[in-house]
């Protein structure tokens, strides 16, 4: 058990870190020069960091103190989101760079998004598995065990594009030198580019729309389980049964086919 305000901090702080590191990671990846390209090394490293830290993140025990569990989960989740940033930012960029044709690129990203949406159809049923006494003695044991299998499975899938996907060559004259000597100049160019980006009104409108859409989605996804179990069924997960899973799956299916 943990105080509600601490649970809120556990959800907010790693996300705040994620928001700050995403544009920085994009800038670093854009200007990286390696024999394997500028995307694949980060995808490889990020998949391992995020997969291992996801497993570690859920290895908490109710016997530990609230302070220990809060600190442990916060630190491991920050490492997880950092690894996710290292993986996802170059991964998305590599997807857009796989084709120079606008329509083909749109189809590629649409298929990738459609496939990824199926994860949200499956994931809600993890609640049912975790709370099933015939599978796990306690829900916390279920979370610890299931996280190992999920983390390893996702790690194996995430590392595939780093090994098998080829990236388009980039003119080195269009890239900056990421060295400590050029740190000040690179920082100024990063900030200048960040400001110039937000001067584009169509892009700014898209950012605002995305902000509200993702906030609405994450709010419903994050609280639906607790509303169904603790408000509608007085905190009894056994009585709630498979309703939380059905709610999540049907919602995800609607967005998948829309």
Locate predicted features.
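Membrane-embedded alpha-helical bundles of multi-pass transporters/translocases
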Residues: 1-258
């Amino acid at each position: 058990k943990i105080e509600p305000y601490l649970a809120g901090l556990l959800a907010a702080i790693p996300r705040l870190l994620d928001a700050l590191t995403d544009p920085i990671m994009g800038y670093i990846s854009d200007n990286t020069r390696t024999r394997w390209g500028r995307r694949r090394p980060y995808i490889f490293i990020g998949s391992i960091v995020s997969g291992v830290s996801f497993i570690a993140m859920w290895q908490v025990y109710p016997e530990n103190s609230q302070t220990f569990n809060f600190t442990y989960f916060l630190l491991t989740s920050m490492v997880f989101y950092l690894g996710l940033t290292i993986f996802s930012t170059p991964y998305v960029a590599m997807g857009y760079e796989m084709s120079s044709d606008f329509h083909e690129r749109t189809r590629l990203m649409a298929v990738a998004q459609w496939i990824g949406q199926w994860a949200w159809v499956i994931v809600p049923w993890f609640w049912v598995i975790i709370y099933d006494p015939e599978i796990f003695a306690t829900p916390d044991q279920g979370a610890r065990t299931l996280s190992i299998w999920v983390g390893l499975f996702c790690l194996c899938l995430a590392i595939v594009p780093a090994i098998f996907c080829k990236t388009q060559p980039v003119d080195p004259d269009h890239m900056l030198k990421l060295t400590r000597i050029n740190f000040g100049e690179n920082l100024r160019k990063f900030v200048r580019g960040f400001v110039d980006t937000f001067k584009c009104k169509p892009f700014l409108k898209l950012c605002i729309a995305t902000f509200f859409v993702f906030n609405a989605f994450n709010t419903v996804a994050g609280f639906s389980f607790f509303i169904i179990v603790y408000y509608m069924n007085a905190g009894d997960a056994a009585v709630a049964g498979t309703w939380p899973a059905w709610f999540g799956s049907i919602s995800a299916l609607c967005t998948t086919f829309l």
